[in-house]
């Protein structure tokens, strides 16, 4: 560092010390002058000698330099005139004449230079900061040199200037030499010891050490090698920077030393052809110093392009054209123009640098002016933002837009006065850029002195080089660090959508969360496509210690600046659009997430439409995004797509000339005389269709006409060329001028160009809703352009100091409004200069009044956009049909027309926006008649379009149940009938809408097709009405097992059928086909085929969890068992090319008696085909062979003693011999028992050749025969068993077979397989025993959402299953992203248990809250309900399942989280339901369309006017649904409703609201209270009256059937009504009453069980039938079905009745022919069958059977027999001697 202190009094000056190294000639020059005076820089000595000669002087402002200044503070005195005056000028003297002088700073400088105080004058104002007066030259010279010395040291920034009143040429030469030496010494010191040079050298040393550390390592990995290469490149870049700095300093030294023959050796290392500075003429010390300062800044800033300066200049000097490729941030845009201006290369005239945007040109101009301040003359750098034919290019460096340069070219086709053109940002390949390149390409051959430089960050350099005559390419390497690329493609489908946000946005948020959790610190930059996605991502990203920031073009400067700020302790996560690709460089970015998508405006030549759509980025853009991560340190880029996707991307962004309308370009080319557009040499030629469509558009606009095959500009076309706007905007302006609405036309063009950014809709959900409310006040019913016009008109009427605040208050973008104002001013100037028209300053259009000007404006807009016409289709779901393409598109949600709730028949739009759907934006309504006033006429047939418009027809009189069934589950039936209608009429526009709330169907079809569609819908409705009338409930009469009668309870509360004979009524329908089946067609087909009546339908879930049974369509119940039997007797039905099969259903009864469903019972069986060798091998687990050997020594298997020995050839095998004909299973059972292990593997060595076996076909038949015979089920179907025997290969040891059973027969299957195990088939040898391996399988599928919610619980459950014996579970993903759990077991019980637990987990817990009525649950199907569920799911980490058909809700998750979610859902939904009851609707068929706007105008966007009048009420306006949400009491709502109704009646054409018709209940004949409409006939009743009718019917059996009481109706009340009106308890009572009535009216054919209160019913046997017993399943009593008494086998009913009447008669009848007598004592009847004549009665008496004598003991009786009767009556029979009499029981 140079010493910053002044030299001491007696020492040599700094300058003198430096002179020692200079040539002697210089020293002699100084010495000759020094002989007369002191050393020049010895300030102290000089002033000590000379100060006495001066008086105390003070210089006032505007003093005369030719005389001594007079003091304004002392009396005028005569002073000596100073010979020399040294002035200090402010650094920005030319720019400031009012800057306050820094008096203290001046005094300190004077003191530092030892200038006497009396010589100092400090003016208060002006460009002169101070002046010093001197009498002696030596003092003046020393002061000037000292002041420059201190300025070079950085002690002050004033510019010293000498004003000599006495001019001596030698004095000036001496001062020049002194300053030259001073500056030269300063330059040398900077080169040797400058602070910046030291830092750079340290940086070089540090990089070299890092490179050396890699060089010492061997075998570098690829990543490390790449890092080494990056460090070497960075080191070389720094070295080149230092070389450039030294070269620049040497250039300055050469200039300083080379003047006047003064020579100095600067040790040039090489002889450069091109000098970096073109310095000539007299020394400008101020400029030289600024050049030095700028070089020092360049060295410290380290812009990459600085290291390539000489290389660039040499290339431009030698070559006419150059392509310069440098990454964003390399300094191309600011430095190259300065390099050229400094060096003089290609700078003989002006240097023009073009930018694609005006703001960029202005910003760069300011930046270059700031950097080069003092280096050039004033106005060297300028900006020409707009073209003017009267202005010339005069500045040395000019920044302008490419559009502006094109205009200059059209004025001067030689570009006179321009020596170099720089096309910047060429990678954007804008339309103007490509046109400029094409025109300059031709110009270069005419002007060989013109230089062209193409600058770009990512452009295809080779393509540009080839186009521009194979010019040279120079790559400027940036300061990037290596970036690791990670390809992480998403698992979601490419086009899937969540809400209105595409799936890739969710993937970006997930990746950001993952990176934040797992990676080290560093900013995350994520690329999305739009403002909506960016804000959505910021809301969804929730992570600790992180802050989510948005970055998109609509943010204010302050909001954008937030991404550059630091947030201590928090990681920045920036979600940005492609604005962050090249426009901005954000420091600290280490991780980049590339979604791979970008939103681009594309012009489709086929349709002539400009569409803004989301598409894939190019490879160059992907690399540019990845490069964001390597600016300050090595980074990582996560690409959410695969490497294959990257390779398939376009190499570069498609040029704008292929993406936009070519109207502007063609106009300019025609103006230039280029008539053969197709042959013009573009860089990338547009497709011929685009050129043709552009010409057609220009013809339509009246700008071009075709004469003799040649295109010519019309007068209007020439005007459009001069305006330089898009033709449609120019046409808009010219059309308005014709109607004397010039102001409106100019403003319309300005706001239309900025339409997307004027309304500011940013922030969270509430902020956006507020912005929507604020917008309503500006909405105009004529469309968006009128709305924007009214906004600008009101904004322009405000004082300038109020405009920003007004924009903030109304959610408007103040920046966009100012941009519109600038555009308006530019257009006004352009119109006045180029078209010589006077732009009016007044408005003639009034947004608050409908006048003829509205019509004029709409006509002008239509003429300007005649090709962008759309017609309302008549169907909201289709929206509008674009006239030229027949596309169906919707109005954008931000469209002003939606604020009025109307869809105009005809609209004209600005462009098509393609996001998730396609939308019309910038829409204006017009009348149909205006199309006939267009000249030329529109390019489509408007009349034909109007004829094709869809008409609407309403179908009323249908109940809500019929409508719901008409729609089907998930609207499947409705979609099917729509599809049939479209196919029938060959019109894809046909639509059918069902409004259940209004009980109506709306049909949308053309007039020709309406009859067909109406007939189709009516047929379907009649089917549904018929099935609703026939609908029955299956009711089991009691709970239990055995024979349970089933009642079919149907309409009219009647029993339609009572099944007591155990015949089946319900069947399962299986559909085997790939196509989606129409349920209604299928049911109608079955009814016709079977000629039966269907009374109940149950459709299995479309995504049911038993995926193995996906062929099961559903279950239907027939009204008679004969129909059901007939359906099952047919093996299969041919239904539209697919197969239908019908099986009896075993799971009926409304859910209580359902048997569990299993997938097919699969058994694998095998039997050996090769005989055993008697030896086998036991494979042991590793390390356990010794313990196993110990367990199985002395082993006996069956009757065989086996020999055990260890296998010498294997460490884990044991050989077992002596097995005989034992099978593997028999041996393994014994081994497992002895070792108590289940991990053994045993196999038998079998002989080489197989024995003769029956054929596989014979085996199949035999197996089927045996298994089917063992099925114990009643009447099993023959196809319930399938057997497949596989053909064996030569080396197979076993025959194998697969057996599948019907899943409903799992118990029978298990029994049959158990009996089959161990059997031998005919034709097989005894050792060929069958081994059965039963495999019971089932599977459950859950969606990815449920799986992600219960993943941890599911894994725990599966792990527990793994530890259990008897079953296995495995989890696997399916092709559609769901997950399947497969259950496999060897018995049904483990399957059932596992499945039950899995179902409980995956199906979730149902919400059984009393407040969860169907009306409340229906809210979950709305958008608000869906958002509520998503919010709760996210907060509680649960998943909510909504059954839309049954209106039930289940929640999946842990028990604690389910409880929390249930509480929040119930509370939130109940609150929402309550709020819905307090809503005021602002649109409807009888409401004025502008009511919402009137409400906002009258009461304010926040409805403050209503709140002030209704105290305590909380209101919120929902502009999308036109609803005021009232939070308060019902009385408050009524007050608000009253105020709104009063406003609605004002100016309303509808007048007063008609009186409502009071409806009368047909039962009570009073006004309906709490009404209910019957489903069958839609008649309205009081609900209480209907309930009373049901109660009366239960008490009176004659009241059945229950019918509608409306006059002339008499329709039976259907089951759906009874379900809706009655509780389950009351419904059971009604069914019981109906059963009683049914039995009573059966004419004795049916009877209740004789047991009191027993609900069972049996059929009475006919006269010719025998009395079969009825065994009651409820009370287990046995009843004769003929006589209804106790069951009496072997006795006729008539005789049994007689026995019942006279029991003795039955005894006598029984005793006939039998040895029967009575006990003399107890009179019991005794029958003797065998034994002796001694009997003992139950009363204890011993009786002689011969004479009936009675004894008290046995011995006397025996004695009596022997004595009286000659023996006991037995001959040695070996029977007991004392038989006991068995009394006969009377019946």
Curated annotation (Swiss-Prot):
A motif (DEAH box) lies at residues 424-427. GO terms for cellular component: chloroplast. Zn(2+) 1 binds at residues 1561, 1564, 1582, 1585. Zn(2+) 5 binds at residues 1719, 1722, 1737, 1739. Residues 1-75 are annotated as: Disordered. The active site is at 1732. Residues 507-673 form the Helicase C-terminal domain. One of its GO terms (molecular function) is transferase activity. Residues 1557-1764 are annotated as: TRIAD supradomain. PROSITE patterns: DEAH_ATP_HELICASE, HELICASE_ATP_BIND_1, HELICASE_CTER, TRIAD, ZF_RING_1, ZF_RING_2. ATP binds at residues 326-333. It is an enzyme of class 3 (hydrolase). Residues 20-60 have a biased composition (Polar residues). Residues 1-33 form a transit peptide. It catalyses: ATP + H2O = ADP + phosphate + H(+). It holds the Pfam family RBD_DEAH11. Zn(2+) 2 binds at residues 1577, 1579, 1604, 1609. Keywords: ATP-binding, Chloroplast, Helicase, Hydrolase, Metal-binding, Nucleotide-binding, Plastid, Repeat, Transferase, Transit peptide, Ubl conjugation pathway, Zinc, Zinc-finger. Belongs to the DEAD box helicase family. DEAH subfamily. This is ATP-dependent RNA helicase DEAH11, chloroplastic.
């Amino acid at each position: 560092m140079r010493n910053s202190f002044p030299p001491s009094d007696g020492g040599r000056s700094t300058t003198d010390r430096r002179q020692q190294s200079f040539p002697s000639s210089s020293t002699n020059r100084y010495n000759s002058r020094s002989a007369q005076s002191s050393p020049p820089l010895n300030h102290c000595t000089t002033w000590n000698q000379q100060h006495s000669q001066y008086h105390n002087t003070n210089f006032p402002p505007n003093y005369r330099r030719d005389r001594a200044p007079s003091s304004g503070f002392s009396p005028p005195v005569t002073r000596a005139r100073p010979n020399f005056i040294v002035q200090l000028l402010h650094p920005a003297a030319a720019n400031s004449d009012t800057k306050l002088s820094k008096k203290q700073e001046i005094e300190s400088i004077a003191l530092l230079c030892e200038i006497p105080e009396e010589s100092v004058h400090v003016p208060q104002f002006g460009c002169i900061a101070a002046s010093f007066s001197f009498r002696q030259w030596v003092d003046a010279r020393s002061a000037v040199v000292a002041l420059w010395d201190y300025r070079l040291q950085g002690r002050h920034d004033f510019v010293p200037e000498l004003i000599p009143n006495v001019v001596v040429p030698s004095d000036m030469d001496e001062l020049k030499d002194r300053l030259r030496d001073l500056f030269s010494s300063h330059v040398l010191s900077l080169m040797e010891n400058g602070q910046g040079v030291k830092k750079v050298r340290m940086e070089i040393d540090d990089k070299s050490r890092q490179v050396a550390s890699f060089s010492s390592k061997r075998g570098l990995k690829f990543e490390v090698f790449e890092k080494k290469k990056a460090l070497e490149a960075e080191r070389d870049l720094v070295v080149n920077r230092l070389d450039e700095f030294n070269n620049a300093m040497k250039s300055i030294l050469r200039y300083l030393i080379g003047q006047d023959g003064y020579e100095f050796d600067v040790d040039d290392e090489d002889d450069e052809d091109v000098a970096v500075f073109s310095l000539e003429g007299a020394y400008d010390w101020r400029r030289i110093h600024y050049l030095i300062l700028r070089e020092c800044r360049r060295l410290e800033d380290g812009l990459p392009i600085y290291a390539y300066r000489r290389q660039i200049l040499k290339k431009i000097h030698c070559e006419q054209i150059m392509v310069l490729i440098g990454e964003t941030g390399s300094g191309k845009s600011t430095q190259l123009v300065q390099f050229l201006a400094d060096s003089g290369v290609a700078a003989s005239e002006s240097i023009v640098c073009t930018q694609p945007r005006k703001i960029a040109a202005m910003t760069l101009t300011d930046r270059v002016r700031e950097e080069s301040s003092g280096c050039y003359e004033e106005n060297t750098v300028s900006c020409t933002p707009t073209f003017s034919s009267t202005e010339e290019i005069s500045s040395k460096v000019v920044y302008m837009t490419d559009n502006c340069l094109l205009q200059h070219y059209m004025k001067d086709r030689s570009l006179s006065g321009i020596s170099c053109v720089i096309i910047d940002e060429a990678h954007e390949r804008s339309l103007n850029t490509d046109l400029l390149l094409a025109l300059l390409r031709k110009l270069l051959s005419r002007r060989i002195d013109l230089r062209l430089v193409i600058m770009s960050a990512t452009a295809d350099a080779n393509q540009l080089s080839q186009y521009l005559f194979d010019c040279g390419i120079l790559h400027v390497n940036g300061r990037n660090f290596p970036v690791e690329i990670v390809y992480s493609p998403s698992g979601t489908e490419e086009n899937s959508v969540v809400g209105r946000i595409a799936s890739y946005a969710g993937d970006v948020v997930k990746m950001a969360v993952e990176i934040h959790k797992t990676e080290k610190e560093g900013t995350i930059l994520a690329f999305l496509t739009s403002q909506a996605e960016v804000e959505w991502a910021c809301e969804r990203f929730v992570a600790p210690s992180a802050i989510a920031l948005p970055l998109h073009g609509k943010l204010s400067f302050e909001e954008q600046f937030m991404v550059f700020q630091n947030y201590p302790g928090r990681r920045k996560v920036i979600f940005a659009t492609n604005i962050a690709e090249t426009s901005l460089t954000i420091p600290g970015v280490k991780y980049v997430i590339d979604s791979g998508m970008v939103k681009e405006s594309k012009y489709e030549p086929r349709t002539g439409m400009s569409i803004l759509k989301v598409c894939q980025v190019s490879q160059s853009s992907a690399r540019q995004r990845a490069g964001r991560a390597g600016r300050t340190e090595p980074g990582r880029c996560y690409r959410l797509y695969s490497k294959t996707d990257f390779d398939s991307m376009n190499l570069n962004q498609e040029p704008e000339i292929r993406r936009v309308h070519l109207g502007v370009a063609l106009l300019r080319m025609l103006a230039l005389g280029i008539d053969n557009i197709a042959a013009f040499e573009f860089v990338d030629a547009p497709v011929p269709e685009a050129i043709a469509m552009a010409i057609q558009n220009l013809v339509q606009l009246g700008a071009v006409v075709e004469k003799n095959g040649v295109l010519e500009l019309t007068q209007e076309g020439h005007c459009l060329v001069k305006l330089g706007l898009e033709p449609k905007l120019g046409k808009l302006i010219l059309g308005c001028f014709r109607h004397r609405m010039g102001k409106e036309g100019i403003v319309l063009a300005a706001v239309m160009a900025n339409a997307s950014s004027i309304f500011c809709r940013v922030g969270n959900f509430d902020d956006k809703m507020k912005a929507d409310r604020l917008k309503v006040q500006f909405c105009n019913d004529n469309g968006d352009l009128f709305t924007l016009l009214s906004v600008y008109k009101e904004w322009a009427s405000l004082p300038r100091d109020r405009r920003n605040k007004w924009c903030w208050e109304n959610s408007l973008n103040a920046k966009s409004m100012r941009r519109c104002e600038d555009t308006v001013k530019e257009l006004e100037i352009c119109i006045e200069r180029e078209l010589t028209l006077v732009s009016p300053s007044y408005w003639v259009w009034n947004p608050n009044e409908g006048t003829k000007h509205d019509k004029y404006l709409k006509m002008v807009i239509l003429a300007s956009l005649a090709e962008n016409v759309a017609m309302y289709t008549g169907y909201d779901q289709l929206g509008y049909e674009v006239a030229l393409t027949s596309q169906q598109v919707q109005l954008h949600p931000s469209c002003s027309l939606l604020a009025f709730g109307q869809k105009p028949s005809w609209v004209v739009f600005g462009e098509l926006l393609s996001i998730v759907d396609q939308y019309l934006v910038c829409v204006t309504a017009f009348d149909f008649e205006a199309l006939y006033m267009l000249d030329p006429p529109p390019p489509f047939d408007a009349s034909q379009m109007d004829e094709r418009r869809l008409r609407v027809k309403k179908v009323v009189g249908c109940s809500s149940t019929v409508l719901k069934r008409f729609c089907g589950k998930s609207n499947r039936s409705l979609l099917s009938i729509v599809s049939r209608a479209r196919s029938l009429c060959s019109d894809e526009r046909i639509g059918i809408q069902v409004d259940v709330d209004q009980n109506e169907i709306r049909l949308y079809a053309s007039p020709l097709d309406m009859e067909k569609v109406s007939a189709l819908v009516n047929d379907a409705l009649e089917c549904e009405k018929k099935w609703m009338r026939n609908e029955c409930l299956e009711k089991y009469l009691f709970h239990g097992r055995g024979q349970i009668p089933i009642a079919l309870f149907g309409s009219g509360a009647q029993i339609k059928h009572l099944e007591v004979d155990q015949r089946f009524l319900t069947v399962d329908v299986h559909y085997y086909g790939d196509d989606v089946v129409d349920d209604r067609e299928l049911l109608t087909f079955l009814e016709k085929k079977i000629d039966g009546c269907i009374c109940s339908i149950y459709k299995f879930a479309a995504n049911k969890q038993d995926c193995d049974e996906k062929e099961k369509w559903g279950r239907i119940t027939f009204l008679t068992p004969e129909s059901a039997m007939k359906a099952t007797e047919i093996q299969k039905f041919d239904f539209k090319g697919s197969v239908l099969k019908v099986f009896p259903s075993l799971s009926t009864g409304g859910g209580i008696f359902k048997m569990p469903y299993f997938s097919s019972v699969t058994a694998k069986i095998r039997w050996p085909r090769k005989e055993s060798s008697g030896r086998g091998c036991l494979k042991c687990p590793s390390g356990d062979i010794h313990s196993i050997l110990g367990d199985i020594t002395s082993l006996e298997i069956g009757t065989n003693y086996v020999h055990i020995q260890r296998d010498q050839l294997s460490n884990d095998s044991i050989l077992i011999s002596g097995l005989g004909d034992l099978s593997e299973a028999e041996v393994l059972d014994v081994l497992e028992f002895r070792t108590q292990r289940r991990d053994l593997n045993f196999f038998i060595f079998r002989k080489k050749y197989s024995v003769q076996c029956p054929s596989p076909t014979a085996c199949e038949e035999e197996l089927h025969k045996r298994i089917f015979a063992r099925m114990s089920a009643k009447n099993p179907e023959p196809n319930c068993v399938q057997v497949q025997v596989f053909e064996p290969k030569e080396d197979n040891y076993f025959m194998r077979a697969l057996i599948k059973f019907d899943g409903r027969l799992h118990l029978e299957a298990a029994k049959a397989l158990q009996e089959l195990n161990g059997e031998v088939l005919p034709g097989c040898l005894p050792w060929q025993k069958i081994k059965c391996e039963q495999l019971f399988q089932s599977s459950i599928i859950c969606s990815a959402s449920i799986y992600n919610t219960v993943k941890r619980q599911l894994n725990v459950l599966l792990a527990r299953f793994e530890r259990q014996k008897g079953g296995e579970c495995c989890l696997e993903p399916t092709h559609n992203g769901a997950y399947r759990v497969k259950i496999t077991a060897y018995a049904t019980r483990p399957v059932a248990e596992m499945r039950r637990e899995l179902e409980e987990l995956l199906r979730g817990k149902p919400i059984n809250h009393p407040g969860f009525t169907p009306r409340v649950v229906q809210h979950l199907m709305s958008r608000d309900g869906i958002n509520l569920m998503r919010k709760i799911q996210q907060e509680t980490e649960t998943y909510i399942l909504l059954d839309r058909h049954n209106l039930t809700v289940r929640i999946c998750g842990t028990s604690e989280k389910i409880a929390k979610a249930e509480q929040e859902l119930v509370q939130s939904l109940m609150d929402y339901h309550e709020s819905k009851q307090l809503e005021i609707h602002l649109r409807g068929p009888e409401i004025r369309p502008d009511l919402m706007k009137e409400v906002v105008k009258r009461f304010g966007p926040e409805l403050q006017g209503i709140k002030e009048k209704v105290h305590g009420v909380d209101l919120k306006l929902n502009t999308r649904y036109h609803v005021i949400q009232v939070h308060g009491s019902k009385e408050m709502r009524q007050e608000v409703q009253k105020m709104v109704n009063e406003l609605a009646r004002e100016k309303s054409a509808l007048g007063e609201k008609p009186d409502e018709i009071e409806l009368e209940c047909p039962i009570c004949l009073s006004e309906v209270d709490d009404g209910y409409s019957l489903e069958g006939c839609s008649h309205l009743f009081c609900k209480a009256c209907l309930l009373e009718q049901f109660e009366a019917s239960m008490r009176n059996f004659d009241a059945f059937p229950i019918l509608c009481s409306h006059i002339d109706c008499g329709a039976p009340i259907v089951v759906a009504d009874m379900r809706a009106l009655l509780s389950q308890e009351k419904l059971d009572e009604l069914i019981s009453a109906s059963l009683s009535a049914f039995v009573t009216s059966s004419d004795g054919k049916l009877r209740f069980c004789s047991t009191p209160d027993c609900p069972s019913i049996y059929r009475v046997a006919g006269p010719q039938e025998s009395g079969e017993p009825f065994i009651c399943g409820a009370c287990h009593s046995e009843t004769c079905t003929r006589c209804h008494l106790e069951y009496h086998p072997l006795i006729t009913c008539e005789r049994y009745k007689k026995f019942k009447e006279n029991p003795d008669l039955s005894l006598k009848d029984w005793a006939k022919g039998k040895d029967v007598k009575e006990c003399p004592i107890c009179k019991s009847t005794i029958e003797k069958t065998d034994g002796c004549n001694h009997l003992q009665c139950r009363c204890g008496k011993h009786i002689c059977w011969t004479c009936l004598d009675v004894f008290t003991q046995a011995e006397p009786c025996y004695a009596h027999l022997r004595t009286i009767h000659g023996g006991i009556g037995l001959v040695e029979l070996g029977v007991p001697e004392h038989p006991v009499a068995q009394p006969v029981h009377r019946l």
